Amino acid sequence: MITVSGWADTVLVCIVLTSFVLLGSSRLGACIRVVAFQGVLLGFLTLAARQDDPSLRAPILALVSTGLKGVAFPWLLFRALRDANVRREVEPFVGYGLSMLIGTSFLAGSLWLAGKLPLPNPAISTLLVPVALFTMLVGLFLIVSRRKALTQVLGYLVLENAIYAFGVGLVEGTPMVVELGVLLDLFVAVFVMGIAVFHINREFDHIDADRLSALRDWAG
């Protein structure tokens, strides 16, 4: 029989693999699906972390998290992708091969740093902290190393996934209303980002963030 730690380890390894897929893939549609799969994995992680909780709190939180991260957010992003009429991240600031190498260094650094951190509560898995740190670094890297605004939104979601994993795996007794409130804030943020990407593409015929940074205000 697989223990709680065993289930958590499996989920966390899958999160690492999906993060590497994001670093090495140029297809925006595939990246959205990978981030959606990460959201589903976090739902399973929620259930594994709260297995001893007899209340309905864990299933409700897992269901809401999976619904938002695995269904609602991808739907909004696919809609923005269709409206923007782009399919690939063609010329990122950092190439995909180098991104994979940097990701490997992120993973090694996260494993080293996790062993140095004094944690007040035992984690559900020894992999939780290094995987969460690694995923956080991957999210930040996607934000700064990709040109397309849509890919940067995906980086933001990956960053939030890492923070969510930290909270679920380490913090005990957080009121569910607070956790659901954070998910609602994230939903609003992604909704606004999707609208912004659509309007940027409509006004400028592209969603390249580096080209937008060259704009200047011409006050009369």
Identify the function of each model-found stretch.
Residues M1-G220:
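Alpha-helical transmembrane segments of multi-pass membrane proteins predominantly involved
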